[in-house]
Amino acid sequence: KEKWGYVDLYKDDLLEDKDFYFVHAVNRAPMLLNKKLFIEHLEHIDFSFAPFHCDDCELCLRAWLYGLKVGWYNAGFKSMVAGGMRIWNKGLMGFQEIKNRGKLYEMYKSSLEEITGLVTEANKTL
């Protein structure tokens, strides 16, 4: 099962009691970005994922490949099923999710091992 964007699938004993650890990707709600690093290294959000399913994962995976890190902090965010785009986009949501996950896989399938290694090494520093 894919773990990009799904923090509860990280069940590593070394991370179990931590409020922060490095992950492949985080969900944009909430997502904090360093503006200077974003502009210097990432430059843009990939709007080809519109209406905005997986663009957050794509940004995070790209960040790892550009030498940046992606961390997860327990901010108390609980729901990924209510509000936001889900209110107005119910008809396209399932289709767009499947389409964009396939696109994300094609974009990063050759980099998965590299990114996973970077995440693993970053977590060893905690």
Task: Give, region by region, the residue ranges found by the protein language model.
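Catalytic cores of nucleotide-sugar-dependent glycosyltransferases that transfer UDP/GDP/TDP-activated
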Residues: 1, 31-32, 45-47, 116-118
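A recurrent flexible, glycine/aromatic-enriched loop bordering the glycosyltransferase active site
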Residues: 2-3, 9-36, 52
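Intrinsically disordered, low-complexity regulatory regions of eukaryotic regulatory proteins
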Residues: 6, 53-56, 95
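Intrinsically disordered, low-complexity peptide-like regions
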Residues: 6, 15-17, 87, 98, ...
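Donor nucleotide-sugar recognition loop
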Residues: 24-28, 35, 39-79
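Non-catalytic N-terminal targeting/anchoring module and adjacent flexible stem/linker
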Residues: 53, 124-126
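Catalytic core of nucleotide-sugar-dependent glycosyltransferases
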Residues: 75, 90-121
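Mature extracytoplasmic/periplasmic domains
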Residues: 80-90
